[in-house]
Amino acid sequence: MDEAAGDLKQALPNTCDNVQIHVEVHQKSNSTAKKEDIRMSVLKLLNRHNIVFGDYKWTEFDDGFLNSNVQSVSIVDTELKLKERQPIDLSKSSLTIHIFHLNEEGPSIENLEEENEDIVAANHWVLPAAEFHGLWESLIYDTEVKSHLLDYVTTTLLFSDRNVDSNLISWNRVVLLHGPPGTGKTSLCKALAQKLTIRLSYRYRYGQLIEINSHSLFSKWFSESGKLVTKMFQKIQELIDDKDALVFVLIDEVESLTAARSAFKAGTEPSDAIRVVNAVLMQIDQIKRYPNVVILTTSNITEKIDMAFVDRADIKQYIGPPSAAAIFRIYLSCLEELMKCQIIYPRQHLLSLRELEMIGFVENNVSRLSLVLKEISRRSEGLSGRVLRKLPFLAHALYIQSPSVTMTAFLQALSLVVDKQFEERKKLADCV
């Protein structure tokens, strides 16, 4: 075992330096310490631990000031910039420290009054919100979706701040994520809003996330829907007017608001639907003039979205089912959580795919369980991210039912529940 571990250590690349590293500092809710004091203490911590392997989180400190005022210090998003898992020399890196409090109040509901009836039009969060803490890290994709979205919005806000003439260089601050259900599109929008609020805290004091309830904006009197859309955006305008706030407008299943004109021409959509489309497009055109707003939209049925809306989206990103490599990383994060909670016990070190590749996927005492997980991941292809994160729970509920279990036994249960998932899908398909 020692020999195998030594082979792995030898295969690891040299340290990586001269990279930008983001450090997120979660300040305790009851802390009133000055950010500059926290920043100086965090820098001292990083100076004492200046070599890290990828993302890393501290939750316990030998510094009394940090213990009293800080919940956690996290080195984040290293995988977005580094293609390989490399040791990072923090002393030779450019460190950007983001200090934030979490808002723990939860969402509020925005109502619109119509014909003496209150219509739930939207959910409203003040960011960064405790509800979304850790959501960004839980979302795993094959392509560079997360880094592209971060870079896009950062560039958008930079161009706005520098007063770039939008008549010469056009951008609309609209993102469209499309793909099959269960791939994490809505979660990614919420996580992106949270992440950007933290990253841009030097520029905006807080964030606002408004999730529009598309279906409720269609009143039972369809002709009123256009008016409801206008009323909703008037409320959003009030938030945008606060220049200290970064405002995100999330329209989930945007196809329900932007029914295609082609369907109207074919006679399958009522003329009132066009009024709704026009109302949405007009409101987007009005608020895009403001530098502190970003519109995030999702769709499960891309072909039903009005092309005039699609053209307004700067980024049209397909979010598909995860590959075997992404599934492996999803399972790895689930198993790590179960080991942390001692449901899987004793703790076992599982290798990443990169580490397996560096030892040529050779089976030994160090790699055996990781190779089993790799095979389970291969057999899980075709399942959505939403389903994959349910499988560890189902594995325990259906095949274990004990307070703690070994990693070997848990992987056997996970393998069985994957087979069961595909069997149930086949039965459902046969019934249709």
UniProtKB/Swiss-Prot annotation:
<dbReference type="GO" id="GO:0016887">
    <property type="term" value="F:ATP hydrolysis activity"/>
</dbReference>
<dbReference type="InterPro" id="IPR003959">
    <property type="entry name" value="ATPase_AAA_core"/>
</dbReference>
<comment type="similarity">
    <text>Belongs to the AAA ATPase family. PCH2 subfamily.</text>
</comment>
<dbReference type="GO" id="GO:0005634">
    <property type="term" value="C:nucleus"/>
</dbReference>
<dbReference type="InterPro" id="IPR003960">
    <property type="entry name" value="ATPase_AAA_CS"/>
</dbReference>
<comment type="function">
    <text>Plays a key role in chromosome recombination and chromosome structure development during meiosis. Required at early steps in meiotic recombination that leads to non-crossovers pathways. Also needed for efficient completion of homologous synapsis by influencing crossover distribution along the chromosomes affecting both crossovers and non-crossovers pathways.</text>
</comment>
<dbReference type="InterPro" id="IPR044539">
    <property type="entry name" value="Pch2-like"/>
</dbReference>
<dbReference type="GO" id="GO:0005694">
    <property type="term" value="C:chromosome"/>
</dbReference>
<feature type="binding site">
    <location>
        <begin position="179"/>
        <end position="186"/>
    </location>
    <ligand>
        <name>ATP</name>
    </ligand>
</feature>
<dbReference type="GO" id="GO:0006302">
    <property type="term" value="P:double-strand break repair"/>
</dbReference>
<keyword id="KW-0221">Differentiation</keyword>
<keyword id="KW-0469">Meiosis</keyword>
<dbReference type="Pfam" id="PF23563">
    <property type="entry name" value="TRIP13_N"/>
</dbReference>
<keyword id="KW-0067">ATP-binding</keyword>
<dbReference type="InterPro" id="IPR027417">
    <property type="entry name" value="P-loop_NTPase"/>
</dbReference>
<dbReference type="GO" id="GO:0048477">
    <property type="term" value="P:oogenesis"/>
</dbReference>
<dbReference type="InterPro" id="IPR001270">
    <property type="entry name" value="ClpA/B"/>
</dbReference>
<dbReference type="InterPro" id="IPR003593">
    <property type="entry name" value="AAA+_ATPase"/>
</dbReference>
<keyword id="KW-0896">Oogenesis</keyword>
<protein>
    <recommendedName>
        <fullName>Pachytene checkpoint protein 2 homolog</fullName>
    </recommendedName>
</protein>
<dbReference type="GO" id="GO:0051598">
    <property type="term" value="P:meiotic recombination checkpoint signaling"/>
</dbReference>
<dbReference type="GO" id="GO:0005524">
    <property type="term" value="F:ATP binding"/>
</dbReference>
<dbReference type="GO" id="GO:0007130">
    <property type="term" value="P:synaptonemal complex assembly"/>
</dbReference>
<keyword id="KW-0744">Spermatogenesis</keyword>
<keyword id="KW-0547">Nucleotide-binding</keyword>
<dbReference type="GO" id="GO:0007131">
    <property type="term" value="P:reciprocal meiotic recombination"/>
</dbReference>
<dbReference type="GO" id="GO:0007283">
    <property type="term" value="P:spermatogenesis"/>
</dbReference>
<dbReference type="Pfam" id="PF00004">
    <property type="entry name" value="AAA"/>
</dbReference>
<dbReference type="Pfam" id="PF23242">
    <property type="entry name" value="AAA_lid_TRIP13_C"/>
</dbReference>
